[in-house]
Amino acid sequence: FRDCFKLSRDDFYSLLTAANKLPTTAQPPPGDFLQVMQEAAAAGQEAVVITISSALSGTYESALMAQDQLDQKDQVAVFDSRTASLGEGLLVLKAQEMAEAGLGKSEILKELTKIRSRLFSVFTLDTLEYLQKGGRISKAQAVMGDVLNIKPILEVNKEGRIVPREKARGRRRAIKRLLDIIAEDGRELYNQLVIIGHSRCAEEAIAFADELKKLYNPKEVQIGEIGSTIGTHT
């Protein structure tokens, strides 16, 4: 199914919690991209396609394949976000702002590249269960981690890969550490948009946002729920 089209996020996460086996995920086929690209080209419009990191998914390659089949190739650009989920969403928001301000495809791509170089994504997981089910860690590692109440803290590196950063004992310490990392790695937070993503823990996300505002007073804070593609594996 397509995320949010045939199954709501709440329904998806309810099914995921009860599942013994993880659902599988797949990138959109080139035909889906091609249809949208053709519609934009037929309307005389330029299009910028922003995809999940090519290091995490074949979506970028799928979009490039679609572009290659398009007669009006120069009207479309495919941009590798080198991130995922709400980090990718931030780039989409920035691209939309620029398009509405009248910037063209080339100008938008130039600015997106600058924004991408400054983008920073860090997160923690409450359980190792889904990493184990997805084959990313062994069952023994997952069991030991849960027994010791280990919460991994991960980040998306500049190549667009999810890599371990550190570990914390207990969720409270992990959340506190996230706030510290934002201060350590964030630049000019008073002038930045910070997006907080969560998976079925909206109240905690709101509390985190409140603490973030109190400590660092960023320009803007938004909260969103993580979609099924990333949620499946985390």
Language model features with spans:
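N-terminal glycine-rich anion-binding loop in soluble enzyme alpha/beta folds
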Residues: 1-27
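N-terminal glycine-rich phosphate/adenylate-binding segment common to multiple enzyme folds
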Residues: 32-63
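Mixed-charge interfacial surface used for oligomerization/domain docking
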Residues: 1-5, 19, 55-77, 83-234
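Short coil/turn segments at secondary-structure boundaries
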Residues: 27-31, 193
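A short glycine/small-residue-enriched secondary-structure motif
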Residues: 7-13, 37, 41-42, 64-69
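Short catalytic-loop micro-motif centered on adjacent basic/acidic residues
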Residues: 24, 49, 78, 195-196
